[in-house]
């Protein structure tokens, strides 16, 4: 009995390590491809233009963003991609760059970018909100202006209804190095999804060890 228990423990440990290492490799690859996307000049230009479009007044800027956020949420509540504000952000140059990335890396089921204030610039999907700066992932990636890579635990994404991992990375001005916006994606772990769902069961998220993090 002791030998059997010992063998089972060793096999389970090996399986856990293998799964963790495999997941670590997938996440490293994902971060590398997203980092390349953050260097896309056309994408950055769209973000810079939106940042420059605001009045030089923080209160007025927030009022403008809040107004658009209400319009956006109304459109989302009625599943309306034809709303002019939504349609603009699904079809502009930033969105087209994100769609191209998504075609190459289809496990990214939702990709979008915000400006420095957390307002959407372009997106592949109609998100639940226009304003994103109040989200944990946004604040973590912004990191008080220093920037950081954010990786969530596996969770059910409210916009897509699928189990995935959220990644968020800062977008920087090439000339100054300053953060100008945030890139976020929901990444579906297709090769591991069945195993993850079995572990999560009826809950919506789980803790996960990521090697090197």
What are the functions of these language-model segments?
Residues 95-198:
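Extracytoplasmic/periplasmic ligand-binding sensor regions of membrane-associated signaling proteins
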Residues 15, 93-94:
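Short linear interaction motifs
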Residues 35, 193-197, 205:
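Generic hydrophobic alpha-helical scaffold/packing signal
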Residues 39, 110-117, 206-213:
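Short hydrophobic alpha-helical segments used for membrane anchoring or interfacial signaling
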């Amino acid at each position: 009995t002791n030998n059997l228990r010992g063998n089972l423990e060793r096999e389970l440990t090996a399986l856990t390590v293998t799964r963790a290492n495999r997941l670590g490799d997938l996440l490293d690859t994902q971060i590398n491809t997203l980092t390349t996307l953050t260097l896309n000049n056309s994408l950055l230009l769209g973000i810079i233009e939106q940042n420059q479009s605001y009045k030089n007044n923080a209160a007025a800027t927030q009022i403008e963003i809040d107004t658009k956020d209400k319009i956006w949420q109304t459109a989302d509540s009625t599943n309306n991609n034809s709303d002019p504000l939504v349609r603009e952000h699904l079809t502009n140059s930033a969105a087209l760059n994100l769609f191209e990335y998504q075609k190459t890396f289809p496990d990214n089921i939702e990709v979008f970018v915000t400006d420095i204030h957390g307002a959407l610039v372009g997106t592949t999907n109609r998100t639940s909100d226009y304003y994103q700066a109040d989200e944990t992932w946004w604040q973590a990636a912004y990191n008080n202006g220093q920037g950081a890579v954010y990786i969530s635990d596996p969770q059910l994404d409210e916009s897509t209804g699928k189990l995935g991992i959220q990644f968020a990375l800062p977008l920087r001005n090439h000339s100054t190095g300053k953060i100008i916006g945030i890139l976020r994606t929901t990444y579906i772990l297709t090769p591991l999804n069945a195993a993850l769902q079995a572990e999560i069961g009826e809950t919506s998220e789980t803790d996960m060890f990521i090697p090197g993090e």
